[in-house]
Amino acid sequence: MNDLLPAAAAPAGARALPLRHADPEIWRAVDAERQRQMHSIELIASENFVSQAVLDAQGSVMTNKYAEGYPGRRYYGGCRHVDVAERAAIERARRLFGCEYANVQPHSGSQANQAVYLALLAPGDRILGLDLKAGGHLTHGAHVNLSGKWFEALSYGVDPVSHRIDMDEVERTARRERPRLIIAGGSAYARVPDFARFRAIADATGALFVADMAHYAGLVAGGAFPSPVPFAHVTTTTTHKTLRGPRGGMILTDDADIARRIDAAVFPGLQGGPLMHVIAAKAVALGEALQPGFRAYARAVIDNARALCARLAEGGLSIVSGGTDCHLGVVDLRPWGLAGNAAERALEEAGITVNKNAVPGDAASPAVTSGIRVGSAACTSRGMGPAEFRQIGDLVLAVLGGLRDGGQAGGRDAVPARAAELSRRFPLPY
């Protein structure tokens, strides 16, 4: 009869079963994903491999706890232990990025940006961000996003030759349009933004300057990439990507008034209960980033990205902006007559994961694109170095070369085995 009981009425022992026995379908999906991560080359720039400690914290009993509010100011009882975790995350974020205030509750980078808009803008205000096809992010004013629907979104681009942000265009647009908010950062821009000039332009035009460092926060934490925090009124970030933590968001500022407004925007303005198991995992990841070894990791990420981009360029591929200053590179496939979606598909069949990506001046649809984005953070976490990334570059060239020459999945015969062997040499800890 017990197998007919609803879950809530099932014996306590049934609820103690491990996933493998409690829900075999989902266990198989989870294990298959673990195997995929273990045996493939991960080049998606926004992905990384967290530590076992981060996994442990995120899978902990803190997922059971509701904790609306902030440490010491909760709307629920029984929060003394989750308060320890959130306070630790806040203090570690402040130490790591050298700021006065940190809100660690946003569920994602997108919600961190939304909270900033809610705190600092009124509907219809003007915002100025990097154009999506030039490497910007949806939440910086794309017309399909809330940021482009609720606000008057303007964009700046990159120089058509150097593919670097045209700061003169930023200044001209800001002086002419007088945006309330200027945003620096993106999801596919490989160079260091001029944070000092962004702030100067904002000050000269009466705007607030927001830096979105979601992609390079870990590089900033490791001292390998300039920090926007001293220049921006507000800095937003994710806690995964190069920071190598759980999926989530965070907001940093040195301004007490802005901090109060952001806290109110996050809760109760945008979110209800924070995800305390995720915040605990954020604290763990931030603690890891404070360790001396993380600085070596951050430097290695950039060295590896440069090695990969250099090898791809040597093989005849066009790298947007000619290289990279961070963990990612964008490959313009138009000279090879390839579409981004076809390249993504062929590489995945060969055991190499990338994402299709728009390139400056792209006429293709977002579902097709004319480029791919590659990144080094994940494979660097596995211990790979420049020599391995040059090998990865050779594998990518073999696949795309075969595709260009007429094969639907170029390099199908040779590349998968080589990619799998490289993965086996650098196993994941789980």
Swiss-Prot record:
MF terms in GO: glycine hydroxymethyltransferase activity; pyridoxal phosphate binding
EC number of the protein: 2.1.2.1
Obligatory cofactor(s): pyridoxal 5'-phosphate
One Pfam assignment: SHMT
Functional pathway: One-carbon metabolism; tetrahydrofolate interconversion; Amino-acid biosynthesis; glycine biosynthesis; glycine from L-serine: step 1/1
Function: Catalyzes the reversible interconversion of serine and glycine with tetrahydrofolate (THF) serving as the one-carbon carrier. This reaction serves as the major source of one-carbon groups required for the biosynthesis of purines, thymidylate, methionine, and other important biomolecules. Also exhibits THF-independent aldolase activity toward beta-hydroxyamino acids, producing glycine and aldehydes, via a retro-aldol mechanism.
Name of protein: Serine hydroxymethyltransferase 1
Organism: Bordetella bronchiseptica (strain ATCC BAA-588 / NCTC 13252 / RB50)
